[in-house]
């Protein structure tokens, strides 16, 4: 399990966000304006946005600042949500991290992989936590806080932590756990790009340390080793003896070499297969759902079996 220093060292809440998270929008175009309104309607503290050419104005009810350093100085923002188009998104991530953000959530798709290598390096140097890119963001129903494009009406405060590479399957799992009366503690969409910030293990560790999270749904897809790495950590810590974990892997029918949606969803050289991931997770004590419609049913059964409901 994780020590309390895990939270303190990152200068942020254990589950990335809480009711006091102050968010700044980078990329206040049509999408940035639309989703910033929805976030505020939900209850998120969105304190401003950055646009170098429109500093001093008000857009979508938000004060506009010249750069990230200025918005941090003026608002004490500690999290950034990025809608900047792909050519400038990496620079926006780096600017946010170097301005002192504890969390950066990048929605942008099609960021060049070479750019993301630079971003990952800066994130490591600054201690900033990156979620994404190419992700729906994250949501915490209990504090009415969300960063991203996740629809809020299917979520309800509760016991299940969800970590997913797929946006739509995130919503499937959330709706199922809401219908089952379990609800969600925090839901994190980590994105499907090859060079993502947070991976499954990073989020599962936080769920393991969080007292509100009593069960976990892990949603993966073909390609990469994020799911296998999570399975190794789950097995090492014997997590499933304390908290049930249910997993679904998308792309089981994908032919080798065929990309399935996300840039990272590709089986190459015999690695990253759905079966390989299922095998690793099952060996770690994770219950496998081979159909997304079973995720809610299986986590309910596991929670009941362990006396958590």
Curated annotation (Swiss-Prot):
Keyword Ligase carried by entry: yes
Catalytic activity: GTP + succinate + CoA = succinyl-CoA + GDP + phosphate; succinate + ATP + CoA = succinyl-CoA + ADP + phosphate
EC numbers: 6.2.1.5
Keywords carried by this UniProt record: Hydrogenosome, Ligase, Nucleotide-binding, Transit peptide, Tricarboxylic acid cycle
SUPFAM superfamilies reported for this sequence: NAD(P)-binding Rossmann-fold domains, Succinyl-CoA synthetase domains
Binding site for substrate: 171
GO biological process: tricarboxylic acid cycle
Transit peptide stretch: 1-9
SMART domains documented for this protein: CoA_binding
Main location: other
Keyword Ribosomal protein tagged: no
MF annotations from Gene Ontology: nucleotide binding; succinate-CoA ligase (ADP-forming) activity; succinate-CoA ligase (GDP-forming) activity
The protein's enzyme class: ligase
Residues annotated for CoA binding in this entry: 54, 107-109
Pathway named in the protein's UniProt entry: Carbohydrate metabolism; tricarboxylic acid cycle; succinate from succinyl-CoA (ligase route): step 1/1
Compartment annotation: Hydrogenosome lumen
Gene Ontology terms: cellular component: hydrogenosome lumen; mitochondrion; succinate-CoA ligase complex (ADP-forming)
Membrane-spanning residues: none
Subunit record text: Heterodimer of an alpha and a beta subunit.
Entry function: Succinyl-CoA synthetase functions in the citric acid cycle (TCA), coupling the hydrolysis of succinyl-CoA to the synthesis of ATP and thus represents the only step of substrate-level phosphorylation in the TCA. The alpha subunit of the enzyme binds the substrates coenzyme A and phosphate, while succinate binding and nucleotide specificity is provided by the beta subunit.
Family: Belongs to the succinate/malate CoA ligase alpha subunit family.
Protein name as it appears in the record: Succinate--CoA ligase [ADP-forming] subunit alpha-3, mitochondrial
Gene that specifies this protein: ALPHA-SCS3
